[in-house]
Amino acid sequence: MDDLREFAQLFPAWWFGALGVLGLIVGSFLNVVIYRLPIMLERRWRQDIELETGVADPDTRYNLWWPPSSCPHCQQAIAVKDNIPLFSWLWLRGRSRCCHQSVSVQYPLVEVITMLAFLAAGLLWLPGMALWGALILLSFLLVLTVIDIKTLLLPDELTLSLLWMGLLFNLSGTFVSLNDAVVGAMAGYLSLWLLYWAFKYATGKEALGYGDFKLLAALGAWLGWQALPNLVLVAALSGLVVTLIWRGLRKEDTAKPLAFGPWLAIGGVFGMIMNGFNL
Protein backbone atom coordinates (compact mmCIF):
# COMPACT_ATOMS: atom_id res chain seq x y z
CA MET A 1 0.00 0.00 0.00
CA ASP A 2 2.89 2.35 0.77
CA ASP A 3 4.28 1.72 -2.73
CA LEU A 4 0.94 2.65 -4.28
CA ARG A 5 0.79 5.84 -2.21
CA GLU A 6 4.28 6.74 -3.30
CA PHE A 7 3.35 6.09 -6.94
CA ALA A 8 0.25 8.32 -6.61
CA GLN A 9 2.36 11.14 -5.19
CA LEU A 10 5.22 10.80 -7.69
CA PHE A 11 3.10 10.25 -10.81
CA PRO A 12 -0.27 11.95 -10.19
CA ALA A 13 -1.21 12.05 -13.89
CA TRP A 14 -0.79 8.29 -14.24
CA TRP A 15 -2.56 7.67 -10.94
CA PHE A 16 -5.61 9.76 -11.80
CA GLY A 17 -5.65 8.35 -15.32
CA ALA A 18 -5.82 4.85 -13.84
CA LEU A 19 -8.56 5.94 -11.41
CA GLY A 20 -10.55 7.42 -14.30
CA VAL A 21 -10.30 4.24 -16.36
CA LEU A 22 -11.26 2.18 -13.30
CA GLY A 23 -14.26 4.45 -12.82
CA LEU A 24 -15.44 3.88 -16.40
CA ILE A 25 -15.07 0.10 -16.05
CA VAL A 26 -16.87 0.02 -12.70
CA GLY A 27 -19.55 2.34 -14.11
CA SER A 28 -20.16 -0.13 -16.92
CA PHE A 29 -20.70 -2.88 -14.35
CA LEU A 30 -22.99 -0.64 -12.32
CA ASN A 31 -25.19 -0.29 -15.40
CA VAL A 32 -25.48 -4.07 -15.48
CA VAL A 33 -26.58 -4.10 -11.83
CA ILE A 34 -29.05 -1.26 -12.41
CA TYR A 35 -30.63 -3.08 -15.36
CA ARG A 36 -30.54 -6.67 -14.13
CA LEU A 37 -31.11 -6.58 -10.38
CA PRO A 38 -34.76 -5.41 -10.57
CA ILE A 39 -35.41 -8.12 -13.18
CA MET A 40 -33.74 -10.73 -10.95
CA LEU A 41 -35.93 -9.66 -8.00
CA GLU A 42 -39.08 -9.82 -10.13
CA ARG A 43 -38.15 -13.31 -11.34
CA ARG A 44 -37.52 -14.45 -7.77
CA TRP A 45 -40.89 -13.05 -6.71
CA ARG A 46 -42.57 -14.83 -9.61
CA GLN A 47 -40.85 -18.12 -8.75
CA ASP A 48 -42.04 -17.82 -5.13
CA ILE A 49 -45.63 -17.43 -6.36
CA GLU A 50 -45.21 -20.44 -8.65
CA LEU A 51 -44.01 -22.55 -5.74
CA GLU A 52 -47.08 -21.58 -3.71
CA THR A 53 -49.53 -22.19 -6.55
CA GLY A 54 -47.81 -25.31 -7.85
CA VAL A 55 -47.63 -23.85 -11.35
CA ALA A 56 -44.05 -24.25 -12.53
CA ASP A 57 -42.74 -22.06 -15.30
CA PRO A 58 -39.26 -23.13 -16.38
CA ASP A 59 -37.02 -20.09 -16.44
CA THR A 60 -33.62 -19.57 -17.97
CA ARG A 61 -30.65 -18.74 -15.77
CA TYR A 62 -30.42 -15.00 -15.27
CA ASN A 63 -28.01 -13.14 -13.00
CA LEU A 64 -25.42 -10.36 -13.10
CA TRP A 65 -23.03 -12.54 -15.10
CA TRP A 66 -25.32 -14.54 -17.39
CA PRO A 67 -26.53 -14.26 -20.10
CA PRO A 68 -23.93 -12.07 -21.85
CA SER A 69 -24.83 -8.46 -22.58
CA SER A 70 -27.40 -8.10 -25.35
CA CYS A 71 -29.22 -5.33 -27.15
CA PRO A 72 -32.23 -4.22 -25.06
CA HIS A 73 -34.31 -3.92 -28.25
CA CYS A 74 -33.57 -6.99 -30.41
CA GLN A 75 -31.72 -9.12 -27.80
CA GLN A 76 -28.76 -9.74 -30.11
CA ALA A 77 -25.49 -10.30 -28.25
CA ILE A 78 -23.31 -7.19 -28.01
CA ALA A 79 -19.81 -7.57 -29.43
CA VAL A 80 -16.85 -6.76 -27.21
CA LYS A 81 -15.87 -3.80 -29.41
CA ASP A 82 -19.35 -2.33 -28.86
CA ASN A 83 -19.19 -2.78 -25.10
CA ILE A 84 -16.29 -0.45 -24.27
CA PRO A 85 -17.43 1.94 -21.52
CA LEU A 86 -18.47 5.38 -22.82
CA PHE A 87 -16.44 5.23 -26.04
CA SER A 88 -18.66 2.63 -27.75
CA TRP A 89 -21.76 4.72 -27.03
CA LEU A 90 -20.08 7.82 -28.45
CA TRP A 91 -18.67 5.95 -31.47
CA LEU A 92 -22.09 4.51 -32.32
CA ARG A 93 -23.75 7.88 -31.62
CA GLY A 94 -26.05 6.48 -28.99
CA ARG A 95 -27.47 3.71 -31.17
CA SER A 96 -27.13 -0.06 -31.23
CA ARG A 97 -25.12 -1.49 -34.10
CA CYS A 98 -27.49 -4.41 -34.67
CA CYS A 99 -30.89 -2.72 -35.01
CA HIS A 100 -29.93 0.99 -34.96
CA GLN A 101 -32.34 1.73 -32.12
CA SER A 102 -31.41 4.46 -29.64
CA VAL A 103 -29.56 3.39 -26.50
CA SER A 104 -30.47 5.19 -23.28
CA VAL A 105 -28.22 8.05 -22.24
CA GLN A 106 -28.28 6.47 -18.78
CA TYR A 107 -25.42 4.15 -19.78
CA PRO A 108 -22.76 6.76 -20.58
CA LEU A 109 -24.09 9.06 -17.86
CA VAL A 110 -23.61 6.44 -15.13
CA GLU A 111 -20.12 5.67 -16.45
CA VAL A 112 -19.10 9.35 -16.51
CA ILE A 113 -20.54 10.02 -13.04
CA THR A 114 -18.68 6.99 -11.67
CA MET A 115 -15.44 8.17 -13.28
CA LEU A 116 -15.85 11.67 -11.83
CA ALA A 117 -16.73 10.25 -8.41
CA PHE A 118 -13.60 8.08 -8.42
CA LEU A 119 -11.44 11.05 -9.42
CA ALA A 120 -12.98 13.22 -6.69
CA ALA A 121 -12.38 10.50 -4.11
CA GLY A 122 -8.77 10.32 -5.29
CA LEU A 123 -8.40 14.01 -4.47
CA LEU A 124 -9.65 13.49 -0.91
CA TRP A 125 -7.83 10.28 0.00
CA LEU A 126 -4.51 8.69 -0.84
CA PRO A 127 -4.55 4.96 -1.72
CA GLY A 128 -5.66 3.03 1.34
CA MET A 129 -8.69 1.65 3.13
CA ALA A 130 -10.47 5.00 3.21
CA LEU A 131 -10.18 5.45 -0.55
CA TRP A 132 -11.33 1.90 -1.35
CA GLY A 133 -14.22 2.30 1.07
CA ALA A 134 -15.22 5.62 -0.47
CA LEU A 135 -15.22 4.08 -3.96
CA ILE A 136 -17.45 1.23 -2.77
CA LEU A 137 -19.86 3.56 -0.97
CA LEU A 138 -20.12 5.95 -3.92
CA SER A 139 -20.74 3.06 -6.33
CA PHE A 140 -23.52 1.62 -4.18
CA LEU A 141 -25.15 5.03 -3.76
CA LEU A 142 -25.19 5.60 -7.51
CA VAL A 143 -26.79 2.22 -8.19
CA LEU A 144 -29.39 2.73 -5.46
CA THR A 145 -30.18 6.21 -6.78
CA VAL A 146 -30.90 5.07 -10.33
CA ILE A 147 -32.85 1.97 -9.26
CA ASP A 148 -34.98 4.01 -6.86
CA ILE A 149 -35.72 6.61 -9.52
CA LYS A 150 -36.75 3.93 -12.02
CA THR A 151 -38.60 1.49 -9.74
CA LEU A 152 -39.18 3.20 -6.36
CA LEU A 153 -37.28 0.28 -4.81
CA LEU A 154 -34.18 0.16 -2.63
CA PRO A 155 -33.30 -3.56 -2.73
CA ASP A 156 -32.26 -5.23 0.53
CA GLU A 157 -29.48 -6.94 -1.42
CA LEU A 158 -27.83 -3.53 -1.75
CA THR A 159 -28.83 -1.63 1.40
CA LEU A 160 -28.05 -4.44 3.84
CA SER A 161 -24.79 -5.30 2.08
CA LEU A 162 -23.83 -1.64 2.30
CA LEU A 163 -24.65 -1.57 6.01
CA TRP A 164 -22.46 -4.59 6.83
CA MET A 165 -19.60 -3.28 4.71
CA GLY A 166 -19.74 0.03 6.58
CA LEU A 167 -19.37 -1.80 9.88
CA LEU A 168 -16.52 -3.92 8.50
CA PHE A 169 -14.59 -0.91 7.23
CA ASN A 170 -15.02 0.78 10.59
CA LEU A 171 -13.76 -2.20 12.57
CA SER A 172 -10.40 -0.47 12.33
CA GLY A 173 -11.87 3.05 12.51
CA THR A 174 -11.43 3.81 8.80
CA PHE A 175 -14.01 6.61 8.83
CA VAL A 176 -15.36 6.61 12.40
CA SER A 177 -14.98 4.41 15.46
CA LEU A 178 -16.87 1.11 15.53
CA ASN A 179 -19.01 2.38 18.43
CA ASP A 180 -20.04 5.44 16.42
CA ALA A 181 -20.76 3.24 13.40
CA VAL A 182 -23.01 0.85 15.35
CA VAL A 183 -24.87 3.71 17.02
CA GLY A 184 -25.11 5.42 13.61
CA ALA A 185 -26.71 2.34 12.05
CA MET A 186 -29.28 2.07 14.84
CA ALA A 187 -30.00 5.80 14.92
CA GLY A 188 -30.34 5.96 11.14
CA TYR A 189 -32.92 3.20 11.03
CA LEU A 190 -34.90 4.24 14.10
CA SER A 191 -35.08 7.94 13.19
CA LEU A 192 -36.83 7.33 9.87
CA TRP A 193 -38.86 4.45 11.32
CA LEU A 194 -40.25 6.75 14.01
CA LEU A 195 -40.89 9.50 11.46
CA TYR A 196 -42.70 7.02 9.21
CA TRP A 197 -45.07 5.85 11.95
CA ALA A 198 -45.65 9.35 13.33
CA PHE A 199 -46.63 10.61 9.88
CA LYS A 200 -48.77 7.55 9.17
CA TYR A 201 -50.56 7.89 12.51
CA ALA A 202 -51.21 11.60 11.90
CA THR A 203 -52.27 11.43 8.24
CA GLY A 204 -52.98 7.79 7.45
CA LYS A 205 -50.45 8.00 4.60
CA GLU A 206 -47.01 6.50 4.09
CA ALA A 207 -44.30 9.07 3.43
CA LEU A 208 -41.30 6.74 3.36
CA GLY A 209 -40.42 3.15 2.59
CA TYR A 210 -38.51 0.59 4.64
CA GLY A 211 -35.73 0.76 2.09
CA ASP A 212 -35.15 4.37 3.14
CA PHE A 213 -34.73 3.27 6.77
CA LYS A 214 -32.13 0.69 5.75
CA LEU A 215 -30.25 3.10 3.51
CA LEU A 216 -29.95 5.69 6.28
CA ALA A 217 -28.87 2.91 8.65
CA ALA A 218 -26.17 1.95 6.15
CA LEU A 219 -24.99 5.57 5.89
CA GLY A 220 -24.89 5.75 9.68
CA ALA A 221 -22.72 2.61 9.70
CA TRP A 222 -20.27 4.25 7.30
CA LEU A 223 -20.23 7.82 8.60
CA GLY A 224 -21.28 7.53 12.25
CA TRP A 225 -24.20 8.97 14.17
CA GLN A 226 -22.64 12.45 14.24
CA ALA A 227 -23.05 12.80 10.46
CA LEU A 228 -26.76 11.92 10.44
CA PRO A 229 -28.33 15.33 11.31
CA ASN A 230 -26.51 17.19 8.54
CA LEU A 231 -26.98 14.28 6.16
CA VAL A 232 -30.75 14.19 6.66
CA LEU A 233 -30.95 17.99 6.46
CA VAL A 234 -29.14 18.02 3.10
CA ALA A 235 -31.34 15.16 1.84
CA ALA A 236 -34.59 16.81 2.93
CA LEU A 237 -33.76 20.29 1.64
CA SER A 238 -32.37 19.14 -1.71
CA GLY A 239 -35.27 16.76 -2.21
CA LEU A 240 -37.86 19.39 -1.32
CA VAL A 241 -36.42 22.17 -3.47
CA VAL A 242 -35.73 20.06 -6.56
CA THR A 243 -39.05 18.22 -6.34
CA LEU A 244 -41.08 21.42 -6.01
CA ILE A 245 -39.30 22.99 -8.98
CA TRP A 246 -39.51 19.82 -11.10
CA ARG A 247 -43.18 19.16 -10.40
CA GLY A 248 -44.01 22.82 -10.84
CA LEU A 249 -42.41 22.91 -14.28
CA ARG A 250 -43.98 19.61 -15.34
CA LYS A 251 -47.28 20.25 -13.52
CA GLU A 252 -47.18 16.78 -11.97
CA ASP A 253 -49.63 15.53 -9.36
CA THR A 254 -48.27 16.30 -5.88
CA ALA A 255 -49.71 12.98 -4.66
CA LYS A 256 -47.40 11.05 -6.99
CA PRO A 257 -44.96 8.84 -5.01
CA LEU A 258 -41.52 10.36 -4.52
CA ALA A 259 -38.24 8.45 -4.42
CA PHE A 260 -36.37 9.63 -1.30
CA GLY A 261 -33.39 7.32 -1.79
CA PRO A 262 -31.59 9.63 -4.26
CA TRP A 263 -31.71 12.50 -1.78
CA LEU A 264 -30.39 10.30 1.02
CA ALA A 265 -27.61 9.33 -1.38
CA ILE A 266 -26.81 13.01 -1.98
CA GLY A 267 -26.73 13.51 1.78
CA GLY A 268 -24.40 10.51 2.03
CA VAL A 269 -22.04 12.00 -0.55
CA PHE A 270 -22.07 15.26 1.40
CA GLY A 271 -21.23 13.37 4.59
CA MET A 272 -18.43 11.50 2.84
CA ILE A 273 -16.93 14.76 1.57
CA MET A 274 -17.07 16.25 5.07
CA ASN A 275 -15.35 13.14 6.39
CA GLY A 276 -12.67 13.45 3.73
CA PHE A 277 -11.98 17.03 4.81
CA ASN A 278 -12.16 15.94 8.47
CA LEU A 279 -14.94 18.45 9.13
Swiss-Prot record:
EC number per UniProt: 3.4.23.43, 2.1.1.-
UniProt-listed PANTHER family: PREPILIN LEADER PEPTIDASE_N-METHYLTRANSFERASE-RELATED, TYPE 4 PREPILIN-LIKE PROTEINS LEADER PEPTIDE-PROCESSING ENZYME
GO MF annotation: an example: aspartic-type endopeptidase activity
InterPro entries, per the entry: Peptidase_A24A_bac (IPR014032), Prepilin_IV_endopep_pep (IPR000045), Prepilin_pept_A24_N (IPR010627), Prepilin_peptidase/N-MTase (IPR050882)
Primary role: Plays a role in type II pseudopili formation by proteolytically removing the leader sequence from substrate proteins and subsequently monomethylating the alpha-amino group of the newly exposed N-terminal phenylalanine. Substrates include proteins required for biogenesis of the type II general secretory apparatus.
Pfam families (alphabetical): A24_N_bact, Peptidase_A24
Keywords: Cell inner membrane, Cell membrane, Hydrolase, Membrane, Methyltransferase, Multifunctional enzyme, Protease, S-adenosyl-L-methionine, Transferase, Transmembrane, Transmembrane helix
Membrane topology qualifier: Multi-pass membrane protein
Gene from which the chain derives: outO
Subcellular location: Cell inner membrane
Chain ranges on the Cytoplasmic side, renumbered to this chain: 36-104, 150-163, 205-214, 255-257
Family: Belongs to the peptidase A24 family.
Lineage: Bacteria, Pseudomonadati, Pseudomonadota, Gammaproteobacteria, Enterobacterales
Organism encoding this protein: Pectobacterium carotovorum subsp. carotovorum
One of the record's GO cellular component terms: plasma membrane
Topology Periplasmic: residue spans: 1-16, 124-130, 183-185, 234-236, 277-279
Protein name as it appears in the record: Prepilin leader peptidase/N-methyltransferase
